[in-house]
């Protein structure tokens, strides 16, 4: 609604129209109906922006629904729009049915104005009551004043109607033109010096605004230039090595994109996040902050965040999607941080993205007037060296300020409010401060298994090549696990010949993969007749100076938070054109116009790899300095720093060498990647390779010993910091992502002795790793260490990205798991069937929690076999999957032969009456089950009858959960009969089942004969207030 703050997307416009349609009839606008639909009305009022809300206020004020005092109460700066909307609903409701009807009409008028602007009526310019007429015709006068506020203000000042101070207040840059017009009208209402009469007469003489200025020639010309510019930047995929020109359209493969769900809020268990398409980025419900403008996409390094934005840009430029935006401005955070001079919003958009050839003033004013048609994207926020803060406020779009202040205020909405912003970042760089200003957060989880295969087929169209690569990955689970990150899929594609010809085994660790790509580049840099079979010492030694130059540059860049290098910086690091020709440094993307082309590493992970290579082999790095790397930051500067305490390592060291200073200043998440690479390079697997390149084998041995000691000591310190267990409970550890990197580093070293030593120190009964970005590679590292535990552990990996490949990686440690929690991990039947095949032989495993995955009837036979074969298995939780009656019937067969299961969860599946019947028949004589959940399974009276027969026979079940089904009175009466014969059930949950007073009376009769049952839940059923009171008095065990 409204000019400057129109509805932010076509989807929201359509939703607002639907909501309005529900209230067009007067009979729908009673106070009772108005109050009943309060949440929808709030959504309607906030579906656009503050401009739309103020348009509604204009109409209500003009119709005298709101008094002047009411109106002033809605002008509290800084109040969230949702708060203002709720206050307006309260005010209108208190005024009666007529006011409620007028609010709906005002919303309708405001929306019509936003879609097809028009003037409403006319007024007498010589009215005897000018202030009253200004209010009566306020919507039309605001629109007429919109483009002429400056001129009218100047004229009013010249004639003495307003002071200079009042002019400055109205002209504050935080206000849009329509808001300035409203503030001028507000001033006229309270001034008795003729300003109202002047405005009423002068505004009538202003030209009628026939349409929004979006069709002006200068605007069309700039939009065309911007589309052409963005299209040119996004049409071709910038491959990591810069050696290929690939059309993005031909090679783009969708990643797994999920909206972040807040599992800590009250209410029913959240559904599994659906895999979203890119086109749903701005239309997904479930906002963290409805008043925010910024969309956040988080993902690990190499997960495809930049390519996702490139795809968005291309779809917009080609006119295929995101057409609600007329202007899209892409920015790279690693480029932005290089801007030392102060800049304004105008400078940022025009000088650093796309320059208007004509009409700069008009185009910039258009952007300010219609921010809802603007999209800004900021790629790589984790590479922006300035930490987010909201302390320094900057609201002027024309006044210059520092680049960090400008960016932070754009994200907060202090600048270009209602313009959409998309930010990509690694998770570790997103602070709680920033999340306050995030509208929606998405997780980019890399390729699915199908995505890996599709990408390889797009990259290799030659007959048989993709098939051979896919077979190789499927036979090599460690390599397959790495490839869920697109950067590794690119490496596999790039090195496909080396992988298919390799006889010594496929890469297992991240370091193995990066050494393989290093071999590929080195071999392609020498004549074909000189190429060796692999990365031998001679090949590496021949280019060692180049690799050390690149390593020195990489380390300096990490320490200075610099990821784009000028010619001067390359020269200072002694990087020669010959070094650049190796291919690891490429032209930076998104180069600032007018500047010389700087260079950057293929990817941030390559910069970390070369920094680790330098630390492993440079004679300038004393071994004792490595402690700074494993500190991951200044002492006490971050949770990671506290996790890895400063280590005292024997050996001489200067007061503060330059390498030490760089390591102390680098970002912790980059140091973690570097530390893992260093551990891999110093492993026994690669010892021979590095030893041939090192003049002093003793120095290399000292580095290796230092890395081992650092890892062992850091893990030991971390384990010792775990608080003792509460009396009667198992010792529990809730790990942080920093712990995952320690385990990853240990895995990169591939030393069983170190893994055993680490496992000995992990004396916990419950290891919790929720929300730790655990993917298949992390699963391999965890299994490498946990398989050596001496006591069984409950391993909780909820809300990660384990997937089928990760499940396969976990199998080596399944024997030491007494419980395995894998909720929300995108696991399918294939992964679970492999897990169960192994679990059949793991006597320790007694509990599986698999909520919110992608399980179907296809895994039912495996589940049934597990139940039938494992007579010490205690709990199976399958909530919110896709199990139908057929799957429930198969599982029931497994239950018939089971004598140990105590907890069985099926909520949110689709077992229906047939499935409920099969389960009930299997459980009638079951001697161990204590808890059964069939919530939300489309069970009716037939299923309830079968469950009632089960209750009549079963003597062990203590809790039966049947909420959100269709049991109704007939089913409840059957259950009541079963309760009369039951002696074990303590809790029966029947909320939201369309039960009336008749069904409740049957339950009351059953309760008279049953002293065991403690609670019967009946909330959300069909009872009047009088019936609720009556039932509650009859038996307090009824929870209504």
Curated annotation (Swiss-Prot):
The name this protein goes by in its record: Nucleotide-binding oligomerization domain-containing protein 2
Binding residue positions for ADP: 239, 252-253, 302-307, 603
First and last residues of every LRR repeat: 791-812, 816-839, 844-865, 872-884, 900-920, 928-949, 956-976, 984-1005, 1012-1032
Subunit structure: Homooligomer: homooligomerizes following muramyl dipeptide (MDP)-binding, promoting RIPK2 recruitment. Interacts (via CARD domain) with RIPK2 (via CARD domain). Following RIPK2 recruitment, RIPK2 homooligomerizes via its CARD domain and forms long filaments named RIPosomes. Interacts (via CARD domain) with ubiquitin; inhibiting interaction with RIPK2. Component of a signaling complex consisting of ARHGEF2, NOD2 and RIPK2. Interacts with ANKRD17 (via N-terminus). Interacts with HSPA1A; the interaction enhances NOD2 stability.
InterPro entries: CARD (IPR001315), DEATH-like_dom_sf (IPR011029), Leu-rich_rpt (IPR001611), LRR_dom_sf (IPR032675), NACHT_NTPase (IPR007111), NLR (IPR051261), NLRP_HD2 (IPR041267), NOD1/2_WH (IPR041075)
Short sequence motif named ATG16L1-binding motif, residue ranges: 63-77
Domain remark text: The ATG16L1-binding motif mediates interaction with ATG16L1. Intramolecular interactions between the N-terminal moiety and the leucine-rich repeats (LRR) may be important for autoinhibition in the absence of activating signal.
Modification after translation, per record: Palmitoylated by ZDHHC5; palmitoylation is required for proper recruitment to the bacterial entry site and hence for proper signaling upon cognate peptidoglycan detection. Palmitoylation promotes localization to the cell membrane. Palmitoylation protects from SQSTM1/p62-dependent autophagic degradation.
Annotated residues for binding of ATP: 299-306
Gene name linked to the record: NOD2
GO biological process: adaptive immune response; autophagy; cellular response to lipopolysaccharide; cellular response to muramyl dipeptide; defense response to bacterium; detection of bacterium; detection of muramyl dipeptide; host-mediated regulation of intestinal microbiota composition
Membrane topology of this protein: Lipid-anchor
Ways its activity is controlled: ADP-binding promotes an inactive closed conformation.
